[in-house]
């Protein structure tokens, strides 16, 4: 919502699953972030896959996510699609920009030094304390995000689209 300039929520629909890694004894993977806590006799009651769609007053957002994806590829990105071009923002990395020039689709990939995101986050927080500026982590933004997350969980549980 922050990226969309404070877009207002209209509807959400979401599905969650706990299927791919339900049986840890038979689940095959290359690596896992919680490998050191694995308990083959434990209970897996965590959603391992999510898919959804969000409508706002400015744009729509579709998303998929999985920690157990069974495709052997780790990808974290956000695509911004528009009538003049598109951007793929790689999580905590660079981006590529697609546009049309002289009747041809062109890919541009700016090279620049990426600052430490945690340092920048800390600096923005401290500056906001001094200036009173409302940053992306201001409580109003966080509450909208929390409302969105709750609605996504509710939609998945009720298996229907929800309106705001």
Which residue stretches match the model-derived regions?
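Short acidic/polar mixed-charge low-complexity motifs
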Residues: 8, 57-61, 85-86, 103-105, ...
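A short glycine-threonine-serine/GTX helix/turn-capping micro-motif
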Residues: 39-41, 108-116
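Rossmann-like dinucleotide-binding domain that binds NAD(P)(H)
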Residues: 1-62, 66-72, 140
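Short polybasic amphipathic segments
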Residues: 78, 94-104
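Active-site loop of classical SDR/Rossmann-like NAD(P)-dependent oxidoreductases
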Residues: 89-91, 112-123, 140
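Hydrophobic alpha-helical segments typical of transmembrane helices
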Residues: 8, 76, 121-125, 129
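A short local loop/turn or secondary-structure capping micro-motif enriched for an aromatic residue
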Residues: 69-73, 96-99, 115
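C-terminal helix-rich "cap/oligomerization" subdomain common to oxidoreductases
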Residues: 111, 124-164
């Amino acid at each position: 919502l922050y990226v969309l300039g404070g877009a207002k929520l209209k509807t959400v629909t979401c599905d969650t699953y706990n299927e791919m890694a339900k049986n840890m004894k038979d689940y095959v993977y290359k690596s896992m972030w919680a490998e050191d806590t694995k308990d083959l006799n434990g209970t897996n009651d965590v959603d391992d896959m999510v898919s959804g769609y969000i409508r706002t007053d400015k744009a729509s957002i579709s998303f998929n996510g999985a920690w157990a994806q069974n495709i052997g590829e780790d990808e974290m990105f956000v695509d911004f699609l528009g009538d003049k071009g598109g951007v793929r923002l790689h999580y905590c990395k660079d981006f590529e920009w697609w546009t049309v020039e002289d009747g041809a689709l062109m890919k541009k990939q700016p090279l620049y030094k990426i600052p430490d995101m945690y340092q920048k986050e800390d600096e923005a927080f401290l500056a906001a304390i001094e200036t009173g500026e409302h940053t992306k982590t201001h409580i109003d933004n966080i509450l909208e995000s929390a409302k969105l997350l709750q609605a996504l969980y509710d939609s998945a549980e009720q298996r229907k689209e929800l309106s705001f």
